[in-house]
Amino acid sequence: MWPPGSEDSYSAKMDYGKSVVNILPSVEMLVNFNGEMTRSSKRSCLLYAERVDFKELLQLRLTEKSDQRRMYITTVDSASFQDLKQDQSLNVSFSGFIDNVVRMLKDCQSGKLELHLTTRDQNLSSGREVHDYYLQFVEIRSFKNLVHLSLPCRSAPLNTVLFYINSMLEASHKKQYILEQSMQQMQAEINAQRAHAERLTTENTNIREALAENTRILEEKHAAEVHQYQEKLSKINEQRSNELERNRRAISGFQAQLDKASLEKAELKSAQEQAEKRCQTLSEELSCCKARVCTLKEQNDKLHGDVANIRKHERKLEYKIEDLKQHTVELQEHIQKGNKEKANIAAELEAEKKILHTKRQALEMASEEISKANQIIVKQSQELLNLKKTIAWRTEVALQQEKAVQAKESLLSLRENELREARITIEKLREEIPQQLQSMRNFAQGLEQKYSKQILILKERLAIPTGKENRR
């Protein structure tokens, strides 16, 4: 619990008793005190570990058992935790930090780790820090001690010590008040039990007196009854002796009959043993026969089952044979139809091959004609080049022939246009030939007519200009 009003308090309006949670029960353990001027010593201390539910706040409190005034407090909040995380390379969140602190405290309690309270070097401390000690979790090793965690710690001021001592006194007063109430209740119960015991003692005394009186009366009564019983017993003994003599005689007669019955019993027993042996033999034979009958019955049932399965299998095979026969007939019909279709397709294929061969021959002829037309076009182009050279030479000869030259040039331009159109047409025809091979069945005749007409037109167009030129 944090004392309100001190520097460790976080809100004066909060209910501290409900907010503070003990993360570890208060335990007693040995703590090493390492000072600058004194040697290290182990002292028995009480450790309290507390945290706040709704805020990241942890407090460890050490109190020397021999002197409760010596108290050392370690407080870790979110800001100081970030400093610890940066200085000591911690890799956990605040909740993980609390879990690890609890685990290390349990290790200290079991002896795996030790708690050291070390005095801080005043030369290295800054003016802002108010911590005088370091609370260290140390693992003792043969070569060098390993410090797992070092927390800043300070001596608790007097008001804090008084606050915690006051809290302890209040708790002890509450316990004392509860104990006093329980003692009063127990004292009342003891008084009631004492009164009950006295009442029982009085009743016991009365019962003992009544018991003694009843015992005396019963003894007198029993003495008279015993005298009567003794007289009756003497008479009974005489009668018994007479009956014993009579019984001895009867027993001797019964003994003779018993011996005779024993002989008869022995004979009957031997006969019974023989009968039992015979019965056992017969029972064994009967069990063997029953086992044999069961075996034969199982075999018979199995054979009946096999016969039924074989009959079912035969029926299935018959059904399958019928299905296979029907399927065979259907397959034969399909084969006949397939053979007919195959013959028809072969005839159609042969006819198509013949048509294709004819069309290929026609196409080859058209290709030859196109090549001839190309040769003619090449020759005409050479003639055009020669004419251009002649026209260029004639323009230099005389200005009088300008009109004739202009006419020649117009004719040449017309001829070039015609040649360009012819070349475009030929290129188109060359591109269309591979595509038209696939549709030769429908367009072969049209192609022949088209190519022949175009070749004739080209020949006429090429022949007309050459005739005019010769006339000039």
Curated annotation (Swiss-Prot):
CDD domains, per the entry: HD_SAS6_N (cd10142)
GO cellular component, one term: centriole
Coiled coil residues, start to end: 178-441
One biological process term in Gene Ontology: centriole replication
Principal cellular location given in the protein's record: cytoplasm
Region of interest (Necessary for interaction with Gorab), ranges: 351-462
InterPro entries: SAS-6_C_CC, SAS-6_N, SAS-6_N_sf
Localization terms from the record: Cytoplasm, Cytoskeleton, Microtubule organizing center, Centrosome; Cytoplasm, Cytoskeleton, Microtubule organizing center, Centrosome, Centriole; Cytoplasm, Cytoskeleton, Cilium basal body
Documented effect of changing residue 456 to A: No effect on binding with Gorab or homodimerization
Record note on domains: The 35 nM long coiled-coil domain mediates homodimerization while the globular N-terminus links the dimers at an angle of 40 degrees to form the inner ring.
Reported function: Central scaffolding component of the centrioles ensuring their 9-fold symmetry. Required for centrosome biogenesis and duplication. In ciliated neurons, required for centriole assembly but not necessary for cilium basal body and cilia function. Required for sperm cilium basal body elongation together with Cep135 and Ana2.
Quaternary state and interactors: Nine homodimers form a cartwheel structure with an internal diameter of 23 nM and radial spokes connecting to the microtubule triplets. Homodimer. Interacts with Gorab (via C-terminus); binds as a homodimer to a Gorab monomer.
Protein name per Swiss-Prot or TrEMBL: Spindle assembly abnormal protein 6 homolog
Organism, scientific name: Drosophila melanogaster (Fruit fly)
Gene name in the database record: Sas-6
